[in-house]
Amino acid sequence: PPFPSYSFNGENLSSDENIGIYLEDHYYSQTDAAVVFKRVDNRNGDTRFIYHGNDGTSMPWNDTAQLNYLMPEVREAVIKTIIGLAKQFRIIRFDAAMTLAKKHFQRLWFPQPGTGSDIASRSIHGVDKAEFDQIFPVEFWREVVDRIAAEVPDTLLLAEAFWMMEGYFVRTLGMHRVYNSA
């Protein structure tokens, strides 16, 4: 685990007998909010610690798992999921969308070396800006907006964005509507 004080002795939350999912014990006593949960493959013992989603401003979102959007296959899988939803629902709202804007995704999950991190333990995963831009060349939300326009054009996309990103989301990323819940 990222911190030696973390322990994962609670109930297995997975419905799959092959996989164990465990929240950090302090979640239950409400004395801490861990940045990760534990995933165990019961078939081979492979253990991984998966980060919770987090905007770096307060406690992690313990009901989420952070995806690695540096991986093109992750971005594509999420976009396909959004397109599938758009075929069923003509309005889609993206919660905390600003956390996936490139500058904030890097700040939170792959901070530039020497800058520290807003999420504890992430500074060891630092990536310089040039490398980050090469790995993640196009804004994720621009990809989403363009694909929705091409494949499900009657869909209204609504994004939660703050940190002074509202105009950027509309003018640069093409999001249809933006709201600031802060």
Where are these regions (language model features)?
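Alpha-amylase-like alpha-glycosidases and glucanotransferases acting on alpha-linked glucans and related
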Residues: 2-182
